[in-house]
Amino acid sequence: MMHVNSETGVGQPIEEVGNALASTKTYFHIDATQGFGKLNDSLRSTKYDMLSITAHKLGGPQGIGALILKRDGMYRRPPITPLMFGGQQERGYRPGTTPVALVAGFALAAELCDKEAAEHMAACKRVKENILDQLQGLDYTINGDQENCLPTTLNISFHGVDAEGIFLAVKDHYAFSNGSACNSGSHAPSYVLTAMGLPENLINGAVRISWSYHTLIDLSALKNYTNSISEYC
């Protein structure tokens, strides 16, 4: 189960699911790629068996991630099998020499994110507020439950405007997308927004905007583009 949806930024009810499964023999895996380092408190209080995380979402190095397995009792771990075979590194689950530099970078990024999470999220919230200020006057819908949304992502449908036209309008200054990076090469409608039951016109007009606490871009130019977009909304 996703911790945070990669297209809308909405957090999923992992604590409720974990509690519901705690008394069963079901193994619970959380893909925490989007939420780790941002919503660590919910991960600490959730009952899970497996947790997937990655470094580059924390500002750490690319090419390193981790699968955390929780023990049930002293010895019992969730039963997993390797996808690659060769050496017996990492208890035989993943062959190959451990990339020490990447591991160290991952560890430091995780430590800093945990320590500075509140500060980082406050900075991201300010960016989100600035973006929404620039979009005032436009006819749009924010997709996803904003009460449970990370302040690092906006999924917005502009009424009466195709997303491709918006991409072309802002491409020289801003990098918008119509989905998460893992689906950026797909021209099919967003399966996430489709599953949410959005009408076709909102799906076609949806753009995804994301940022981090490092984002220091000048958003004033966005107003110029939104003025031209408003002619079609």
Indicate where each model-derived feature is located.
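Conserved C-terminal alpha-helix-loop-beta "cap" of PLP-dependent enzymes
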Residues: 154-208
